[in-house]
Amino acid sequence: MNQTIKHISVMKKELIESLKIKKNGIYIDGTFGMGGHALSILKTIGREGRLYAIDRDPNSVFIGNQIKDKRFHIIHSNFSKILNYAKYNNIIGKVNGILFDLGTSSLQIENEKRGFSFKKNGPLDMRMNPHAGISASEWLFKSDINKIYFVLKNFGEERFSKRIAYAIKDYCKKKKINNTFELVDIIKKATPIKNKFKHPAKRTFQAIRIYINQELEEIKKGLENSLKILKPGGRLSIISFHSLEDRIVKNFMMKYSKKATVPYGLPITENKLETLRICKLKIINRIFPTQKEIEKNPRARSSVLRTAELKE
């Protein structure tokens, strides 16, 4: 594992302010990554505070285990299983804040052996947990054109998804796509229009990565389970990096911040009325990175921080 990778956490200051950190509070970092946000929380909480962290990437867990602090604990798991983690630690209904920093980390992107980057040549893997599921190479080889087309279109919003899907399967008739630059070359040849501002492989790599890791389903489950863990007044802060992620977060917060409407005069029992009362969240803010941060950390450009609070 490359320990020299430079990592700058996105909107670190804004995240800490949005979580409204309490000195004796209990917090969960659902996406530890390289620990930038976690370390900021540890610096802010007091002696009685606690920080629990989760990451599906064993390399991130290795980094987390180097933190020798009695207030901190990390496990190797998916953040969709945050409820199980909270049950085990007896903190359901006691958590003051939860954060998710979605997408890939610098640890994954900058390591060519992980296969996430279209700018670095390495094995075409893309798994956030290299010990679970199948690699991108294996999935592309086994999948049919329609499946690949669906993934590229829906998870990458790729304009030339059909052309790229056909090109991939044509190549796979001869051999597997073993490395990232092989896939980049296939995409470049299948893409008729060149955009000097955007790499032609960007959306395809995003789509395959999202599908391989079931990222959107992870987000949905993680958000729903977070509501069962927070204490009243507890906050949920999420940083997303593209429209698919942000749409899920936005819709989730909108869903749980609206009051249910019942047509006037409609007979309804008290029990039924209680099930309709889903107004659990108060939306706190939506924050974008400053121009200064974008200049310092270009990765922050597309990020959005949304925060909501569980109602008292």
UniProtKB/Swiss-Prot annotation:
EC class (word): transferase
Residues at which S-adenosyl-L-methionine binds: G35, G36, H37, D55, F79, D101, Q108
Reaction catalysed by this enzyme: cytidine(1402) in 16S rRNA + S-adenosyl-L-methionine = N(4)-methylcytidine(1402) in 16S rRNA + S-adenosyl-L-homocysteine + H(+)
Single GO MF descriptor: rRNA (cytosine-N4-)-methyltransferase activity
Compartments it resides in: Cytoplasm
Biological-process GO terms, alphabetical: rRNA base methylation
Keyword entries, A-Z: Cytoplasm, Methyltransferase, rRNA processing, S-adenosyl-L-methionine, Transferase
UniProt GO cellular component terms: cytoplasm
UniProt cross-references to SUPFAM superfamilies, sorted A to Z: Putative methyltransferase TM0872, insert domain, S-adenosyl-L-methionine-dependent methyltransferases
Principal location class: cytoplasm
InterPro entries in the record: RsmH, SAM-dep_MeTrfase_MraW_recog, SAM-dependent_MTases_sf
EC number, as in UniProt: 2.1.1.199
Task performed by this protein: Specifically methylates the N4 position of cytidine in position 1402 (C1402) of 16S rRNA.
HAMAP family per the UniProt record, alphabetical: 16SrRNA_methyltr_H
Assigned protein family: Belongs to the methyltransferase superfamily. RsmH family.
Name by which UniProt lists this protein: Ribosomal RNA small subunit methyltransferase H
Source species of the chain: Buchnera aphidicola subsp. Schizaphis graminum (strain Sg)
